[in-house]
Amino acid sequence: MFLGLFQYTIDTAVEHTVEHANLSQEEALMLEENIVPLRQATHVTGFLLTSVFVYFFALFKASSYKRNLLLFLARLLALLIYAPILIFCGAYLDAFIVVATLTSRLLFLTYYSWRYKTYKFLIYNSSTLMFLHGHANYYNGRPYVMLEGGSHYVTLGTDIVPFVSRSNLYLAIRGSAESDIQLLRTVELLDGNYLYIFSSCQVVGVTNSGFEEIQLDEYATISE
């Protein structure tokens, strides 16, 4: 019977064997003594696998908002439904690992959600996010960010963020790191798409490479 995520106990199997084989008390004790090393090895392995899996489950981040929302709901179900089932079945160690790990992670992210008045830290399972006109996505910690888009919109993750003017366009970094990254350069491509370059460092030059005698202004325009 699986009591934990991976922890397998053979106690039930031993009890059924003793019952069906009509073993005496001495024979049953001898059987249990023989399987003690196997039981200990199984419990240690189950503990390690459970710990690794729960840690991965608590920190995993999906690529889209909807998938992150499903993962957030799965974590709540693990706390509210799965952990009590583990306790009821007697898997106290597994239940403790699940509750302690997930609760610690949720409380850590709840602090940033409360501080910045947004639930997206919990949904995205990240302590640092970049915001653009109310939309959020992961921030990799680099001093520059390049986003794709069009003449009046920017693609932030899977969201399309429209804007009227580029003059007030910037990325708000919030969470464990806090800063504003201004829009420094806009690159217009031949196919009509745009590249928006946000950076906390000033741009000192733009180098055109790989066009083989074709001038940059024939294919793209760069504006501040």
From Swiss-Prot:
GO cellular component, one term: membrane
Membrane topology annotation: Multi-pass membrane protein
Keyword Transmembrane: yes
Chain segments annotated as transmembrane: 40-60, 69-88, 95-111
Sequence ranges assigned to domain CoV 3a-like viroporin CD in this UniProt record: 128-203
Domain CoV 3a-like viroporin TM: 34-124
Keywords: Host membrane, Membrane, Transmembrane, Transmembrane helix
Protein name as annotated: Non-structural protein 3
Organism per entry: Bat coronavirus 512/2005
